[in-house]
Every structure is written in structure tokens, then in C-alpha cells.
Amino acid sequence: MAFRWRSLMRFRSTTRLLLLFTFCLTVIHSLGNDVDSCDKLHLGQYLCKEPRIDDATQEPETCKDRVAWVECLPAPNISCRLSNGTQFKFSGEEVGFNKTIPCRNVSGYSYKVAVALSLFLGWIGADRFYLGYPALGLLKFCTVGFCGIGSLVDFMLISMQIVGPSDGSDYIVDYYGARLTRLSITNETYRRMQPSP
């Protein structure tokens, strides 16, 4: 009976030591790996360079499939893991990671030209011919812009960028100019409830 009691006490003390050892290893491991990947830095911990803008398209030169890549520099004294797994402390001058930014698919149709054609020559359908809608352009030409009312409606639709080029691309708009962005509501959209008075 005494033998069982002693072996039970040894087992308990060994179990306690093993648990303490496991806990210490877990704490040391978690303290050593608190550095995240560089692409998971929070806003304010990095600064992304401005993309190089193509003069012809007014979009980033690296734009492909509506996405462009820019280089991001972590702030000074920020430590993070590079893509190859090494930990690095940045001085603010080194590139830490690349980030994607949205860009637009353009194919040569200028917004300024489309609005000017719609305003001055919309009554003969020049705007619709320019945007690639020859049937509507011919119809506007034959009806003198639907007696002016169609020209006014087309001018409003083109200036609000509702009517765009026929190939589905976007207008060429100055990169830092006034661009319209369509907002949509989906099932993931958060709606804040208004307090009732």
C-alpha cells in the first residue's frame, strides 16, 4: 500500500514538472514569434509609394486585370518577417512588401472628348459614334437628336458616366481628376440603424 502511495506521488510530481516545462516552452515560443509578416502590418506602420502613371491611359503602368502593384515601405524601427521568412528591422528606406491597388481598364476613349461631343455635336449623334454605338448615332442623326430631347438626355448620361464605351472599358480620366465610383449594396453591406425619435 505504501509502495502504491509513493509511486502515485512520484507520478503527480513528474506530471506537474512536465506541465510546468510545457507551459514555459509555450510562453518562450509565443514571445519569440510575435513578429508578423510584413504584409499584415496595420495602417500607419507602412507607407506605399505612389504608382507610376502612364500618360496615355492615366492609369498605373503596372495595371493588369483591374489591379496594380505598388511597393510599400515599413516605418522606421518596425520589425516584421519578409516573404522569405527572415525577420528584418526596417529603417524606413527599404521595401518590405508589395500591395495591390485597384485600377481601371481603359482602351482609348476620353471622358473629356465624349462630353464635348455630346454637348456640341450630340444632335447629330457624334457622341454615340465616338463611343462605338453606330446604330444609335445614326438614329440620332436622322432624328436630329430626337428633336433635342435625346441629346439632352445623352449629355446627362455621358456626363454622369452611366453611358460608357461600347467595349465595356472605362473612360480615360485624369488620374487625380474627378472620377465617379459606383457604390453598390450587397448582403455584406453593414447598415447602421437610425435611432427613432
Curated annotation (Swiss-Prot):
Residues 108-155 form the TM2 domain. Its main location: membrane. Residues 33-105, 165-197 are extracellular. It holds the Pfam family TM2. Coiled coil: none annotated. GO terms for cellular component: membrane. Disulfide bonds: none annotated. Keywords: Glycoprotein, Membrane, Signal, Transmembrane, Transmembrane helix. It is found in: Membrane. The chain crosses the membrane at residues 106-126, 144-164. Glycans are attached at residues 77, 84, 98, 105, 187. It is a multi-pass membrane protein. Belongs to the TM2 family. This is TM2 domain-containing protein 1. The lineage of its organism: Eukaryota, Metazoa, Chordata, Craniata, Vertebrata.
